[in-house]
Amino acid sequence: MSHDDQPASRAPARHRAGASYARGEETRKRIVAVAIRVFGERGFEGASTREIAKAAGVNAPALQYYFDSKEGLYQACGEHIAELAVEHFSPVVDEARAVLADEHASRDALFEAFGALLDTLVDHHLLSEHLDDHRLFMAQEQARQENSPLFEMVDRKLGARTRDASLQLVARYCGIKPVDSELRLRVMMLYGQVMGFTHGRRTMLTKLGWEKFGPRELAMIKRLAREQSRTLMDSWR
């Protein structure tokens, strides 16, 4: 074989390897998505790998190939949910921390940073097609073990940073100390006005007379959440 022939002979092999890897990743993601739903519906003990494999359109040995065990698959599900949250929230948390780094930041800038956190929470919980599956999975995990490694992982990667930024933004806006005994509860209540829409979404839509949480509906929720938050924060000064 000539030197000129070699690249042509290697290219198909590289293409096949790349295509095989892409298919493998697609299969892995499909299994994780199905497993999150099944674990959420039945819990870790009640879910069977055979059921998950069938629903994902793969044979049972495929689960062992990709995840080693049922425990490995369960952990991969938790990591997937955590990674999605980190990916979604990290940019806005970083922006909030940048505002906090400016000791001369205006009250408007501080509130806008907090409002962006509220907006991101709305988008994350109401735009996701798989929100209900993820929420059920997390609820099962919380019921399964009180000191959940999954919740500790989420808190380590995202929760602590988000919580700290939120507390400091509200504290500086209101002119109170971040260690104020009531501040943590107040911030939780500000976020709670948004989180209420994530539980029983179908029932909530029916009560509101909406067909879905579309762009118009989300814009209204964000606007009102900001208005109510600012009114409350002004009253705490």
Where are these regions (language model features)?
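Amphipathic alpha-helical segments used for helix-helix packing
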Residues: L126-P149, M153, R202-T206
